[in-house]
Amino acid sequence: MVAVLQSTFAIIFSMEFIVGTLGNGFIILMTCIDWVRRRKISLVDQILTALAITRITLILLVFIDWWVSVLFPALHETGKILRMYFISWTVINHCNLWLTASLSIIYFLKIASFSSIIFLYLKFRVKNVVFVTLLVSLFFLFINTAIVNVYFDVCFDGVQRNVSQVSRLYNHEQICKFLSFTNPMFAFIPFVTSMATFFLLIFSLWRHLKNMKHNAEGCRDVSTIVHIRALQTIIVSVVLYSTFFLSFFVKVWSSGSPERYLIFLFVWALGNAVLPAHTFVLIWGNCRLRWASLSLMLWLRYRFKNIDV
C-alpha cells in the first residue's frame, strides 16, 4: 500500500514540477525578451522575474528531496543532507513568501484609490516601499536561518556526546516538528500583509462601484476590471499562505502515525500545487503575459493542426 501511494504521489509531484517549471520559465523568458526589446524593466516585472526564479528553485528542491527520500532513504536522513536541505528550503521559501507579499503591495498601491495622506504618500513611493519591505525581510531571514542553524549545531553536539542517539537526533520527523513552529512564525508577517491588501482592495472596489452607481454609470469600467484582476491574484496569494500554514500543522498532527501518512501526502501535494496555480494566475493577471500566452497557445494549436494534416 505504501509503495502504491509513493508511486502515485511521485507522479503527482513530477507533474507539478513540470507544470510549475514551464509556467515560471515562461514568465522569465517573456520578461527577458521584453527587457531586451525595451532596454528597461518595470518594478512589477522585476518582482515577477525574481518570484519565478524562486519558484523554480523551490519546486526543484522539493522534487529532488522527494526522490532522494524514496530512492536513498539512508542518505536522506544524514545530518549534512538534512542541514543543507532545510536551510536551503528556509531561505528559498522565505524569499517566495516575501516576494509574493511585495507583489500584493505593488498591486494595492497602484490600483486602490483612497484619499488618505499616508496612502497617497506611499502610492508615489512604491519602489521605496518595496525596497524597505524586502530589506526588513532580510532581517527576519537572518534570524530564521540562524535559529535553524543553531538547532542543527545542538544536534551535532548531542551526537558527539551520545552516539546512540544519532537516529533520533537526525530524524526527519523531529526536524519537521521544529520547523513547523519556526517557519509559520516568520511567515505570519507576509501573510498578514497579503490579507490586509486583499481586504483593502475589496473596500476600494466597493467604494468605486458605489460611486459609479450613484453617478448612474456602468459597472464594468476599466478600473473595476483592474480591481477584480488584482483581487484574483491576491486571493490566490492568500490561499498560498493558508495552504502553507495548513501543511505545517498537518505535518505535526500526522507525524509518527502511519494511518495519517496519506493525509500528510495529500496536503503536501496540495501545498506544492498552489505554487504553479499561483504562477498561472499571475500570467493571466498581467496583460502582456496573458496576450503572450494566448498567442503561444494559438501558435501551438496551429502547428498541431498542420502536423495532423
Swiss-Prot record:
UniProt cross-references to CDD domains, sorted A to Z: 7tm_TAS2R14-like
Membrane topology: Multi-pass membrane protein
Gene3D superfamilies attached to this UniProt entry: Rhodopsin 7-helix transmembrane proteins (1.20.1070.10)
GO cellular component, one term: membrane
Membrane-spanning ranges: 9-29, 56-76, 102-122, 128-148, 186-206, 230-250, 263-283
Extracellular compartment segments: 1-8, 77-101, 149-185, 251-262
Cytoplasmic-side positions: 30-55, 123-127, 207-229, 284-309
Keyword terms: G-protein coupled receptor, Glycoprotein, Membrane, Receptor, Sensory transduction, Taste, Transducer, Transmembrane, Transmembrane helix
InterPro entries: TAS2R (IPR007960)
MF GO annotations: bitter taste receptor activity; G protein-coupled receptor activity
Glycosylation sites: 162
Localization in the cell: Membrane
GO annotation terms (biological process): detection of chemical stimulus involved in sensory perception of bitter taste
Entry similarity comment: Belongs to the G-protein coupled receptor T2R family.
Function: Putative taste receptor which may play a role in the perception of bitterness.
Remaining remarks: Several bitter taste receptors are expressed in a single taste receptor cell.
Protein name, per record: Taste receptor type 2 member 113
Naturally occurring in which organism (per UniProt): Rattus norvegicus (Rat)
Gene name in the database record: Tas2r113
